[in-house]
């Protein structure tokens, strides 16, 4: 008799052909909802169609189907991203002066867009140097392309075609994994496996392959470029990859191959994996050998991290165990139950991811200027300002999104009957203490931060400069910030003995780096002016958090409306006969939070723009004398509200206001148009629904008189729809106005 060990059961993780592919169904507007699919009775139908198209929760309550829809939509998103990237590379290949810029990046400005001569628009094609006329771009693509070793427009064409292939592949994957082989719910909930694959695969192998590309392709090509070799004379990427002797001429350790690696004599590789710190004086960017070293180190960390979690083999961490063991002395059951929340509520999961990614994006904004990663990025002031502003806005939106989805989780997915005495339950039970304390902090910060400015304006108006808070009168030095700067400046040789220079020139202690007689970076001094505006930052951030957190903690119930959870995520008021209950839904808190996020980020980007023009950016003479763009006026001018209005907003708006008739005139038109878009928003925000309904009814009467009445009954926007349209135009108008103001200014003077 043969005894066989039982065969291990193979888990089937996908359903085959679960949903048929039907273009007839998709062609029907609102096919995802019985009500909407019936077609329009009133004009509200089109708004509901847009509001619910991506609200998968409203299509079905089946978590598996919702998960599959989200998964499939992600592939669609990736497809759009590849298409967009492909377009960027195509513009670089077809409409740009990339090759000219590559040969002289200090005198030629990047341009990848040429305007057609229709109705005189060719005025927008400014002279960017090198005999090329086009629109100056500030996206940083040229700098990324140079850093990655792209030396010709042909290579950009090839990459653009590759992007299109990947876009098609992603579209196919989105269809395939919903209609042909759709993963089961268990697959989406297998977090350990997901962590292992994402950490080791995406982040680990991704970083490793990028490090490999940098070592074998970017470093040698950039070494030639920095030495002034004509891009057409530089060997092509595959020659470096296939011919080791070619690399060994630049980096001698390549001649020894992998021997130093396996004999643990890693120091041999120090010619291309460095730990220098600071900036390359030729390009004003981080040392590319430092960056390659960084990606190799990150890859090792993530490859290890991707083998830490317990899957089919009984070793490693289980997330559920980690969470349930996470108990503090004052937190009751601690994180018990969070595992179930995060594997059954994608809103809860998304909320955490948005909060993390939003914070990370803001961190990226701050590192792009203080540690500029790409060659010739630091001296391209327009790109520096654009990258900072862009990443700040994106980070702000993501963080508000985190609060929005946390509130949706509270309303739709939170089950109070199964949660007792865990962390979330405890936070909810003393939410009054949290919100009232936060409210007190906001009042304190608001009065004190603004009060310092009002004091200065008053003293300035009364002609008493000696009584102002300033670096030359009553000093309020940011001593903690200065201490942090100093600690980092002194780190090489003390806490970071391996590093030659500090992580960033901004800490101080070093000399400035100039490229082509322009300042790339220098130690940034902090004084009373920065102390004042930093407290405005603290104030606006805390108010944003107050509004958003109150929305989350009171999403299900409040003293005013105990049954709020039954009313849903967004509702205008608690029904007729209950006055004073409007604008209390979780959605309304997100709506209000967006305005304060806009306030907060605006002050940050204004601070950055002025500070850099005043104290960092500028030209340097052959004698070594630095002339800053605004001549260091930040310290004395930004300490009054009047100074911000007069010396920043008004003084620096002259370029955009006077741009008519020049190649910057598009920014002048955008400045005007975006102000109009912003003003248009006020019509939605300050006006009641009834006003519009009355107006519509008299317009309908006129149509009836002329027998041209539509079949679909016109309706005013609901209160929530009106506020949504209002906040959208407010933010769009405000951001586009700022964009035009910043770019016209910095392209003209930078």
Swiss-Prot record:
GO cellular component, one term: chloroplast thylakoid membrane
Localization: Plastid, Chloroplast thylakoid membrane
Residues that bind [4Fe-4S] cluster: 573, 582
Membrane topology annotation: Multi-pass membrane protein
EC number: 1.97.1.12
Broad class of enzyme this protein falls into: oxidoreductase
Gene Ontology biological-process annotations: photosynthesis
Keywords for the protein's UniProt record, in alphabetical order: 4Fe-4S, Chlorophyll, Chloroplast, Chromophore, Electron transport, Iron, Iron-sulfur, Magnesium, Membrane, Metal-binding, Oxidoreductase, Photosynthesis, Photosystem I, Plastid, Thylakoid, Transmembrane, Transmembrane helix, Transport
Transmembrane segments: 70-93, 156-179, 195-219, 291-309, 346-369, 385-411, 433-455, 531-549, 589-610, 664-686, 724-744
Binding-site list for chlorophyll a': 675
Gene3D superfamilies: Photosystem I PsaA/PsaB
A GO molecular-function annotation: electron transfer activity
Binding site for phylloquinone: 692
Catalytic activity, reaction form: reduced [plastocyanin] + hnu + oxidized [2Fe-2S]-[ferredoxin] = oxidized [plastocyanin] + reduced [2Fe-2S]-[ferredoxin]
Cofactor note: P700 is a chlorophyll a/chlorophyll a' dimer, A0 is one or more chlorophyll a, A1 is one or both phylloquinones and FX is a shared 4Fe-4S iron-sulfur center.
Database matches in PANTHER family: OUTER MEMBRANE PROTEIN, OMPA-RELATED (PTHR30128), PHOTOSYSTEM I P700 CHLOROPHYLL A APOPROTEIN A1-RELATED (PTHR30128:SF19)
Function in brief: PsaA and PsaB bind P700, the primary electron donor of photosystem I (PSI), as well as the electron acceptors A0, A1 and FX. PSI is a plastocyanin-ferredoxin oxidoreductase, converting photonic excitation into a charge separation, which transfers an electron from the donor P700 chlorophyll pair to the spectroscopically characterized acceptors A0, A1, FX, FA and FB in turn. Oxidized P700 is reduced on the lumenal side of the thylakoid membrane by plastocyanin.
Family statement drawn from the similarity comment of this UniProt entry: Belongs to the PsaA/PsaB family.
NCBIfam families documented for this protein: psaA
Subunit structure, as described in the record: The PsaA/B heterodimer binds the P700 chlorophyll special pair and subsequent electron acceptors. PSI consists of a core antenna complex that captures photons, and an electron transfer chain that converts photonic excitation into a charge separation. The eukaryotic PSI reaction center is composed of at least 11 subunits.
Name of this chain's protein: Photosystem I P700 chlorophyll a apoprotein A1
Organism of origin: Lotus japonicus (Lotus corniculatus var. japonicus)
Gene: psaA
């Amino acid at each position: 008799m043969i005894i066989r060990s039982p065969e291990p059961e193979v888990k089937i993780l996908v359903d085959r052909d679960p949903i048929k592919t039907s273009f007839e169904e998709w062609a029907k507007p609102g096919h995802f909802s019985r009500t909407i699919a019936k077609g329009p009775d009133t004009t509200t139908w089109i708004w509901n169609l847009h509001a619910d198209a991506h609200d998968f929760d409203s299509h079905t309550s089946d978590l598996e189907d919702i998960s599959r829809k989200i998964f499939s939509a992600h592939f669609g998103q990736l497809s759009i991203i590849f298409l967009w990237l492909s377009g960027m590379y195509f513009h670089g290949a077809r409409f740009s002066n990339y090759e000219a810029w590559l040969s002289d990046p200090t005198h030629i400005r990047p341009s990848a867009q040429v305007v057609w001569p229709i109705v005189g628009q060719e005025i927008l094609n400014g002279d960017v140097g090198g005999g090329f006329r086009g629109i100056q771009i500030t996206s940083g693509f040229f700098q990324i392309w140079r850093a990655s070793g792209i030396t010709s427009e042909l290579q950009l064409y090839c990459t653009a075609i590759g992007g299109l292939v990947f876009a098609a592949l992603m579209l196919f994957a989105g269809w395939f994994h919903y209609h042909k082989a759709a993963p089961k719910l268990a697959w989406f909930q297998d977090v350990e496996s997901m962590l292992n694959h994402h950490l080791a695969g995406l982040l680990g192998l991704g970083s490793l392959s990028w490090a490999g590309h940098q070592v074998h392709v970017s470093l040698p090509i950039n070494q030639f470029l920095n030495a002034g070799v004509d891009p057409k004379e530089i060997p092509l990427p595959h020659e470096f990859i296939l011919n080791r002797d070619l690399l060994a001429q630049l980096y001698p350790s390549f001649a020894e191959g992998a021997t130093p690696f396996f004999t643990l004599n890693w120091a041999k590789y120090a010619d291309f994996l460095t730990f220098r710190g600071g900036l390359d004086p030729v390009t004003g960017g981080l040392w590319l050998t430092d960056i390659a070293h960084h990606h190799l180190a990150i890859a090792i960390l993530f490859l290890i991290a991707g083998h830490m979690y317990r899957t089919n083999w009984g070793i490693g961490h289980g997330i559920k165990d980690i969470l349930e063991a996470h108990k503090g002395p004052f937190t009751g059951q601690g994180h018990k139950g969070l595992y179930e929340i995060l594997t059954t509520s994608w809103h809860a999961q998304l909320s955490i991811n948005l909060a993390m990614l939003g914070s990370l994006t803001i961190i990226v904004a701050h590192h792009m200027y203080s540690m500029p990663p790409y060659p010739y990025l630091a001296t391209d002031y327009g790109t520096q300002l654009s990258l900072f502003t862009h990443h700040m806005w994106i980070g702000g939106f993501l963080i508000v999104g985190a609060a929005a989805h946390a509130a949706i989780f509270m309303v739709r997915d939170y089950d109070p009957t199964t949660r007792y005495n865990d962390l979330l339950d405890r936070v909810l039970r003393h939410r009054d203490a949290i919100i009232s304390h936060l409210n007190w902090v906001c009042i304190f910060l608001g009065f004190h931060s603004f009060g310092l400015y009002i004091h200065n304006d008053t003293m300035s108006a009364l002609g008493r400069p000696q009584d102002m808070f300033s670096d030359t009168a009553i000093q309020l030095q940011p001593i903690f910030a200065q201490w942090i700067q100093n600690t980092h400046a002194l780190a090489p040789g003390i806490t970071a003995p391996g590093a030659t220079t500090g992580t960033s020139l901004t800490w101080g202690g070093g000399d400035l780096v100039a490229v082509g007689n322009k300042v790339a970076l220098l130690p940034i001094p902090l004084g009373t002016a920065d102390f004042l505006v930093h407290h405005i930052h603290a104030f606006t951030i805390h108010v944003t958090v107050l509004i958003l957190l109150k929305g989350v903690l009171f999403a299900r119930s409040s003293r005013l409306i105990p049954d709020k959870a039954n009313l849903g995520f967004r509702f205008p008021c608690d029904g007729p006969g209950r006055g004073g209950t409007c604008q209390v839904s979780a959605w309304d808190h997100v709506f209000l939070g967006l305005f304060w996020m806009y306030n907060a980020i605006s002050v940050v980007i204004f601070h950055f723009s002025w500070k850099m023009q005043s104290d960092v950016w500028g030209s340097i003479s052959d004698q070594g004398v630095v002339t800053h763009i605004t001549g260091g006026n930040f310290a004395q001018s930004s300490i009054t509200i009047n100074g911000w209005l007069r010396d920043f907003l008004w003084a620096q708006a002259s370029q955009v206001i006077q741009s008519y008739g020049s190649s910057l005139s598009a920014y002048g038109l955008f400045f005007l148009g975006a102000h109009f878009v912003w003003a248009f928003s006020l019509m939605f925000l300050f006006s009641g629904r009834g006003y519009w309904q009355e107006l519509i009814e008299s317009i309908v009467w006129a149509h009836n008189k002329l027998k041209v009445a539509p079949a679909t009954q016109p309706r005013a926007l609901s209160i929530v729809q009106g506020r949504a349209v209002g906040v959208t135009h407010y933010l769009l108008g405000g951001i586009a106005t700022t964009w035009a103001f910043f770019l016209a200014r910095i392209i003209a003077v930078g």
